[in-house]
Structure formats: structure tokens, C-alpha cells
């Protein structure tokens, strides 16, 4: 797995799975650009890591000029772009009959349209360079339906099909596109959602959530980051259009 000096851009890289991916790629001596809407958290990450291979760009991925700027910043800072990891995402809990249109649009804009915009401008550079690799964070919710998050499920179903479409369209240009479908991962975002939408202590809720899969535990962000490392490396060179499910066996039931 030789990722030394490869340039990797990660959206939503300031926390959770994204931050685990940042650390994983830095450990492989890659150059990492983080595009995240949380400027304070991004700057705190830069201070904590204190690594010349790490660069932060404040980015709202629902804004096309901001996406263009993020891609340009990666190329300007490190001289190229080898891997785009579309990881940023949000979740709003509400059944269809109670969901506001504004919240529906917000979830779709971040989870799906933002991925389209980042990919669009990354592909323009990758086509010129004659190679590239895009990794999308999908979800088990893109394969089966989690209860009470229809907008999230719909957006992730779209991510799965967008991944396949790009893989088919750009394989002839030496650009691979794959996605990872995590199950329930122990992240700050999920912890917040657990407390807002369930009764009990955080520890009690986590124990209950862990019962849904055969491994009887929540996933770790690092475990998803390891899948991303594999997809970014030549170890997965014959893979494109694939969806790797990392869910503790949930969808095998």
C-alpha cells in the first residue's frame, strides 16, 4: 500500500470518520487536504496534528464556487489531486409526513448534491491528469432503509447510484470510483443523534444500538478509514463501481 506523496482531499474531514481518514492517510505519508464547513474544528485539527502534509480549506460543499476553490487549493498546495473522498454528510430524523421541505432539501443538498459538485470539479482535474480515484461515503441506509430517516436513506441511495454511474463513465479515463457503506459508527455526530432521539444515557443507548448487528458492537471510525485506505491504494486496482459494506454483519441478516 504505497500512498506516499499522494494528495487526498477529504470532505467532512474535521471529525468522525473523516478525521479518522485524515489520520490514516497522514500515517501513510500522504498529503491531505480537508474541506469542512466547521472552520473552528478544522483549525483546531490543524493545530493538533501539526503536520506540514495537512491543509485545511473552509468549504460549504453545497456551494459550487466553494467546491471549485477546495479542488484548486489542493492542486495549488501539493501540486495535484490523486484521491477525492466525498465524506461530508448530515442526518435529520423525521418521518415523511412530519418533514419540512427545507430539511429534506438540506439533507439532499449536503449528502448528494455536494458530492456531485465536488466530484464534478475533481473530475475536471483528473481527466487532464489522466488518472484519479474517488471514494464516496455511502451508508447501509443506501442499501436498506433505516427507520425514521427517509431523507438520509434517499440521499444515500442516490450516492450508491452516483458512484456506479461515475465508475461506468470514467473507467475508460483511468479513474476509479467506489464507495463504502458503514453501519452504525461511534462518532460525535451519532452520539448527538442518539441523545436527541432516544431515552436513556449515552452508554445505554449505545448498548441497545449495538444489538442490531451480529458483532454486537458499534463500528469505530478507524475501521471505515481502513476501508478507504484500501480503496485509495493499488491493492484495489481492479475495483470500480463497488460498494463495500462495513456494518458488523447487519445487512447479512
UniProtKB/Swiss-Prot annotation:
State the Gene3D superfamilies in the record: NAD(P)-binding Rossmann-like Domain (3.40.50.720)
Q: Which GO terms describe its biological process?
A: antibiotic biosynthetic process
Residue sites binding NAD(+) per the record: 9-31
Q: Which UniProt keywords apply?
A: Antibiotic biosynthesis, NAD, Oxidoreductase
Look up the domain of life of the source: Bacteria
Q: What is its EC number?
A: 1.1.1.385
Q: Which GO terms describe its molecular function?
A: oxidoreductase activity
Per its record, the protein catalyses: L-dihydroanticapsin + NAD(+) = L-anticapsin + NADH + H(+)
Q: Where is the active site?
A: 152 (proton acceptor)
Cited function: Part of the bacABCDEFG operon responsible for the biosynthesis of bacilysin, an irreversible inactivator of the glutaminase domain of glucosamine synthetase. Catalyzes the dehydrogenation of the C7-hydroxyl group in the 4S-tetrahydrotyrosine (4S-H4Tyr) to yield anticapsin (epoxycyclohexanonyl-Ala).
Name of this protein: Dihydroanticapsin 7-dehydrogenase
The protein's organism comes out as Bacillus subtilis
Encoding gene (name): bacC
Amino acid at each position: 500500500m504505497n500512498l506516499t506523496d499522494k494528495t487526498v482531499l477529504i470532505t467532512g474531514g474535521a471529525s468522525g470518520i473523516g478525521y479518522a481518514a485524515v489520520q490514516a492517510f497522514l500515517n501513510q505519508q500522504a498529503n491531505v487536504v480537508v474541506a469542512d464547513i466547521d472552520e473552528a474544528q478544522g483549525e483546531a485539527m490543524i493545530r493538533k496534528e501539526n503536520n506540514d502534509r495537512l491543509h485545511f480549506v473552509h468549504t460549504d460543499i453545497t456551494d459550487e464556487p466553494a467546491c471549485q476553490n477546495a479542488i484548486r487549493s489542493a492542486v495549488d498546495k501539493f501540486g495535484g489531486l490523486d484521491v477525492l473522498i466525498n465524506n461530508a454528510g448530515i442526518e435529520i430524523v423525521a418521518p415523511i409526513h412530519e418533514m419540512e421541505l427545507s430539511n429534506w432539501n438540506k439533507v439532499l443538498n449536503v449528502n448528494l448534491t455536494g458530492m456531485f459538485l465536488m466530484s464534478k470539479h475533481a473530475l475536471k482535474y483528473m481527466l487532464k491528469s489522466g488518472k484519479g480515484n474517488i471514494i464516496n461515503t455511502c451508508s447501509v441506509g443506501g442499501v436498506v432503509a433505516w427507520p425514521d430517516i427517509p431523507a438520509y436513506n434517499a440521499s444515500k441511495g442516490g450516492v450508491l447510484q452516483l458512484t456506479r454511474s461515475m465508475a461506468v463513465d470514467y473507467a475508460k479515463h483511468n479513474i476509479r470510483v467506489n464507495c463504502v457503506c458503514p453501519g452504525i459508527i461511534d462518532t460525535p455526530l451519532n452520539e448527538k443523534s442518539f441523545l436527541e432521539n432516544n431515552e436513556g444515557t449515552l452508554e445505554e443507548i449505545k448498548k441497545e444500538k449495538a444489538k442490531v448487528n451480529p458483532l454486537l458492537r458499534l463500528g469505530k471510525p478507524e475501521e471505515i478509514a481502513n476501508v478507504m485506505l484500501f480503496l485509495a491504494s493499488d491493492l484495489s486496482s481492479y475495483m470500480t463501481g463497488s460498494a463495500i459494506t462495513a456494518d458488523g454483519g447487519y445487512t447479512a441478516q
